[in-house]
Amino acid sequence: MSNYRIILAGQFIFNNQRSFEMALAQYNQRVEIHFKYDVFLRSENIFDVEQNCVNIPRHVEPEITERTWRNTVSALETVCEYAIAGSLSAWKLENGKIIEYREIEPNGDKSAIQSYLLGKRLVGRGEDKAAKEALDQAIQKCERHAKAYERRGYVNFRLKNFRDALYDFNKSIVVNPHSEEAHFGRAFVRIIEKDYVSAIKDFDITLKNSIPHQPIFWKTKRIKGECHLILGEYKMAILELIPVSKRVFQEEDNNFGWQRKVWFNLGQAYLGEENFKEAIIALEKAKGLTEGKDNLSKEDIDGLIKEAKSGKVPSQYRNPLPGNIKTGAPFLS
């Protein structure tokens, strides 16, 4: 019988104490009677009595049977029926590859749920103003709707309402401190404010609460590396950018099209470290790649190759200031 590596993360919010207690009772009943305790999550480890929610920060089980996986997911789906907000992601992996992914989120007829789901669909279609109205309604119905705050934060960011975006991301993080999406969004606002140190802190939390099988993990490493580069923290930039440079992204992945920029910035970081050999290798690699989503020119790359071959560190790398180092914008795409 095959065993699988299981990763779960998420949160369910309940509208009141009664809903929470019913969810808890149903979970315990299914675990005890239906599944004979053949699950890998005990209620006392995931039900937060003080906050009336189910909290599962990133949880990893190295060896779980197919049956235990199915039982646990089924029990969590039962819990979700009583929730008004939240979501849970579950991955089943074999030999490092995802063979099943489940996203569990409320889908009932309550107005808070339907308003959020509508807002989520509208966000995906780029209808930001209509999405904001729907998410406003979801938040009015459920003040602890972390997912609605997070989605509205991204809408406000795209509408360039950066102060409102920061408010939304902060509210989402208060309810769910383990939300990788909310920390990622807040980091973007910090970058707009040129507060790269705070952005890096949020990116660190994003990495802690995401996994390499998610696009957000690699996008975070790429942009975090860029922040380190801007601050002149070249060793840290190299540490983040090397794994991204080695990764192959499929066209449907939003990380696709950024590899030339990654190699260019990696070359800059090596140049700042006075590692001219590796700088030349990275920059030549960038030169050989086709144009992607960056706005780099051939002259940008050739100019740095010339500097690296001269064995001299340009002044902008010796005394880095925000804006002095060209990173291959658009920075926040």
Tell me the role of every PLM-derived stretch.
Residues 105-161, 167:
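Alpha-helical segment of the N-proximal tetratricopeptide repeat
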Residues 112, 146-147, 180-181, 214-218, ...:
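Helix-start (N-cap) detector for alpha-helical repeat units in TPR-like alpha-solenoids
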